[in-house]
Amino acid sequence: QGDSNDLASLKTAFAGSHIIFAVTNFFEPFAKLFDGPKTAEIEKQQGINIAQAAAVTDSLEHFIWSTLPNSHAVSGGKFSVPHFDGKASVDDYIREKEPALLAKTTFLWVTWYHTNYSFPVYTPFKVPTAFADVHVQLGSWSPETPISTIGDVRLNLGKFVRAAVEQPEKAANGAYVLAAVETITVEGLLKLWGETHGKKTKYVKIDPEAFRELWPVLAEELGVMMDYWDATREKSWSDVSGRKVLTKEDLGIQGLQTLEEGLKDLAAKTATA
């Protein structure tokens, strides 16, 4: 069993592997440190450990690194989303230090999960004293902010990984793949949540400082991500070097569950919980 903090254990775990799918968990150390930048440094080192171990795995044919765009670079230095930029630093390491591994690498951008509605900062709630029977979602960003989403990651992610592995001529050599089923606005997503959950909804934009006071630390981490998406819009899932980002259409991926179907399943599970 490999430990992303232990290079030697990773080398042992990877021995004999032909395909490696690597993902780190930013929010595990974040829950202990409550510090985004410090957690990003931990995640960066974990990713470098994984890359170094993969690079010396002689049997390796394809390396898939689950990463995210460099928000600091894309936004021209205006934003830095820790759980994005720590991962993106590993991309830079692979490109600069591991050329042989780069030839076998797909950089996979996994977008917003539909289960993120379970995060307190996203969860719509009923206002007990309100006359209207609506569920409210609070946020400090525009309701027109676009959210690219993979929907149900458990059902859809594997199709992107398989497509990348089966088409290395497109997806290897350091190519970026965007794992998204659709893009929808914040307001549109909330409306769809309401329709699938049988609730009336309303998005209420509030002051950024007030938003962060309601959910300290977590709102800072996720709030800066939403602000980044709001500011950069269609550029948010792009590479500053101009490299093409492959989509589901580019890879011919079919049979993906739609976001609406995923939210219906989520509503059914919530109702029976």
PLM segments and residue spans:
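Conserved Rossmann-fold cofactor-binding substructure of NAD(P)-dependent oxidoreductases
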Residues: 1-19
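Oxidoreductase cofactor-interface core, primarily capturing Rossmann-like NAD(P)-dependent enzymes
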Residues: 5-8, 26-42, 57-61, 69-200, ...
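CheY-like receiver
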Residues: 12-16, 53, 93
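Redox-cofactor binding/interface segments in oxidoreductases and associated redox assembly factors
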Residues: 19-22, 65
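A hydrophobic C-terminal alpha-helical subdomain
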Residues: 172, 208-273
